Design a protein with these regions (language model features):
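Short hydrophobic beta-strand element within catalytic cores of glycosyltransferases
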Residues: 23-26, 42-43
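Active-site helix-initiating loop/hinge in glycosyltransferases
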Residues: 9-11, 28, 105
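Active-site donor-binding loop signature of nucleotide-sugar glycosyltransferases
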Residues: 44-48
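Aromatic "clamp/platform" in nucleotide-sugar-dependent glycosyltransferases that forms part
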Residues: 4-6
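Short glycine/proline-enriched, acidic/aromatic patches that form the donor-sugar handling elements
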Residues: 10, 30-35, 49-57
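C-terminal amphipathic helix plus adjacent low-complexity
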Residues: 53-144
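Short alpha-helical segment that forms part of, or immediately flanks, the ligand-binding pocket
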Residues: 15-23, 30-34
């Protein structure tokens, strides 16, 4: 898979693709860096540049944001390298697939979310039943 994105977010398509044990060439920027390491995938260098004013979209792409621009020559060299040494990159891809299946399984993600909630969500007080004393008020008579 080749993904030269300017800003992927978490990069779920890349994570899912890593599970099929095929080589990945991707931008060395954004959320995919959490699970695509330099030893087992090919990360293409580049630079952050401010978002062009014509790309600004209210509440989506805000002024002052930056995009990652991969270097074309790095991307071309990466593609040639994988083609030339495909067997080596296929072995690395299998290792990456195993690593990501282990570290990003449903159980691991559930455990990580549990830790985040435990560490950052306050313990809310439980509602208790009020035990008020009975008031012995005089009985009122109805007036016609």
């Amino acid at each position: 898979m080749i993904s030269l994105t300017k800003g992927e977010g978490f990069g779920r398509p890349l994570l899912e693709f890593s599970l099929v044990n095929k080589p990945i060439i991707a931008s060395a920027w954004s959320g995919q860096i959490d699970f695509l390491d330099r030893e087992l995938s090919i990360l293409v260098g580049g630079e952050l540049k401010p978002l062009h004013k014509s790309s600004v979209q209210e509440e989506v792409l805000v002024e002052g944001s930056s995009w990652f621009f991969p270097y074309d020559n790095h991307a071309m060299a990466a593609m040639k390298e994988v083609q030339k040494n495909y067997d080596k990159y296929r072995v690395n891809a299998k290792k990456l697939g195993y690593k990501n299946r282990t570290n990003f399984s449903f159980e691991k993600m559930k455990e990580a979310l549990g830790e985040i909630l435990t560490n950052h969500v306050p313990v809310f007080p439980k509602q208790i039943e009020l035990m008020l004393p009975k008031l012995n008020l005089p009985k009122l008579e109805k007036i016609d």
